[in-house]
Each structure stands twice: as structure tokens, then as C-alpha cells.
């Protein structure tokens, strides 16, 4: 006589992962080639400090559409872009209430400068300001997969500039900054806060470089206009991204990408 069996039970058991299959998948996803090693001396600084740097990366608000033959650096904020920047200013003011912002640096492109002006006006009227051409929008190293398809000349020109921008912004606090903080009685928690207002490609590249992840993955990340990214650099050289492209302060009808 033939034994009666449930075909659905056989199919279900075939789908059920076993301990061996879990181990095999673990080996495939955590093999030596896929692992990274953290370089604690990534910023070439060996000074002793107890100050944690907190960098607030802000993408500019929505800008006017890009037109063929027009200088990309002259594009200004739309009315919506200005409203986005104001909302971001108020959000940063809430997050940094009671803390001193050491400096706000912005790209020399009009849309980033205008965003920084709004942030200063509504939240940090006395903050020290700087502008940097290194922070202008550009083409980081060629992305993988390469769906952007910029010319090799564009990447060759922009990638070194963006790397210079990263090195100028991302590093541990110096001992002189530590001493400055020791005299600032209003400061709390041994933190130094810096705001950087720039562009999507720049921020995406910065985040991957700061985390020592493959920078060619930058195009896989997406950032809303006027979004906020928070990166912490600890005295031991450790780096953490506490939020990436946060746009919770914007209403749904204010969410844009361009």
C-alpha cells in the first residue's frame, strides 16, 4: 500500500531554511572580500582631544530648473525652496538650542548661499560664516552602477576637488579647538557643531568617505531638498552617521529632489 503524504507539507518543508543554509548564506554575505577594516588614523591627526565634532550637512532648498547653456551656479531657490530652507532653519534651531555653532560653511553656488542666508537669518544670526568653492556641486568618482553617464573629463576634474572638500571639512577637533571650548562656559557635552550647506552629490560622497565605505556607491543614496544629515567624529577617530537626509520637518507637499 502506498503511504498518503501531504504535498503541501513537502513543499513547505522544502522552503524552510535549515541551519546549514543559514551558515552558507552567512559565509556568502560575510566573506573576507566583503569585510572592511577601519582606519583609525584616517584624518592623519594624532592630537589628543576630548571634543566630539558634530557636522550638520544640509542640502540646499529646491532650485529653479537647470537650462541648457546656463551656469549651474547661478540657479536660485524657488518660493518652495525658500520655504523649505526656513523650515530647516527652524529645525536646526530646535536641535541646537543652547549650543553654540562654531561655524557655518556654504558652497559658492547661489542656491546653497541663499539657503545658508535663510538658516542664519532664522536660527543663527551671529554665526561665523565662510564660503568655499570646494563645496560646489560636481561629479564624484564614477558611480557603480554608472547610470549618470557623465564624461570622464567631468569626473577627472570634479573628483579631486570633492576629495579636497572632504579633507577640509572632516577631521577630528584640534587641541586648539579643545582649548577654545574650555573657555566657553555655555558649551555642553564637549561638542563642536558645524553646519555645512551644500549639494546632494557632495553630501552623498562625504557620508561614504566618512564611513570608509566604497565611494562609488554615492548614486545609490537619495536626499530630499533641505534635508539634514548629522555626522559625528569622536576623539578616537570613530565616525557615526546619526541621521541621513532627514526631512521630517518638511510637510509631504514640500518634499522635492531637484
Predicted regions and their residues:
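Acidic, low-complexity terminal tails and accessory targeting/binding regions
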Residues: 1-54, 125, 135-153, 183-185, ...
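A conserved hydrophobic position in a structured secondary element of the catalytic/binding core
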Residues: 58, 198, 223
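Active-site-proximal alpha-helix that buttresses catalytic centers in soluble enzyme cores
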Residues: 2-131, 151
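Alpha-helix N-cap/helix-start capping motif
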Residues: 109-113, 200-201, 225
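Phosphate-handling substructures
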Residues: 64-65, 70-76, 118-185, 189
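Generic beta-sheet signal
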Residues: 55, 102, 188-201
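Active-site signature of alpha/beta-hydrolase-fold catalytic machinery across serine-
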Residues: 118, 205, 209
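Active-site metal-binding loops of divalent metal-dependent hydrolases
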Residues: 61, 200, 247
Amino acid at each position: 500500500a502506498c503511504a498518503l503524504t501531504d504535498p503541501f507539507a513537502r513543499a513547505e518543508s522544502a522552503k524552510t531554511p535549515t541551519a546549514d543554509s543559514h551558515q552558507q548564506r552567512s559565509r556568502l554575505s560575510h566573506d573576507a572580500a566583503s569585510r572592511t577594516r577601519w582606519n583609525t588614523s584616517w584624518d592623519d591627526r594624532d592630537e589628543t582631544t576630548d571634543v566630539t565634532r558634530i557636522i550638520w550637512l544640509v542640502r540646499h532648498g529646491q532650485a529653479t530648473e537647470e537650462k541648457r547653456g546656463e551656469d549651474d551656479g547661478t540657479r536660485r531657490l524657488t518660493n518652495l525652496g525658500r520655504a523649505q530652507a526656513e523650515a530647516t532653519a527652524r529645525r536646526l534651531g530646535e536641535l541646537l538650542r543652547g549650543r553654540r555653532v562654531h561655524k557655518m560653511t556654504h558652497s559658492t553656488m547661489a542656491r546653497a548661499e541663499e539657503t545658508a542666508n535663510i538658516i542664519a537669518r532664522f536660527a543663527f544670526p551671529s554665526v561665523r560664516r565662510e564660503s568655499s568653492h570646494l563645496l560646489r556641486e560636481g561629479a564624484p568618482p564614477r558611480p557603480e552602477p554608472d547610470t549618470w553617464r557623465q564624461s570622464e573629463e567631468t569626473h577627472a576634474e570634479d573628483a579631486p576637488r570633492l576629495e579636497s572638500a572632504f579633507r577640509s571639512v572632516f577631521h577630528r577637533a584640534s587641541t586648539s579647538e579643545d582649548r577654545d571650548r574650555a573657555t566657553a562656559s555655555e558649551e555642553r557635552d564637549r561638542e563642536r557643531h558645524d553646519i555645512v550647506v551644500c549639494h546632494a552629490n557632495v553630501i552623498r560622497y562625504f557620508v561614504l568617505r566618512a564611513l570608509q565605505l566604497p565611494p562609488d556607491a554615492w548614486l545609490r543614496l537619495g536626499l530630499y531638498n533641505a534635508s539634514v544629515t548629522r555626522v559625528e567624529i569622536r576623539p578616537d577617530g570613530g565616525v557615526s552617521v546619526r541621521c541621513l537626509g532627514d526631512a521630517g520637518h518638511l510637510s509631504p507637499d514640500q518634499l522635492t529632489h531637484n
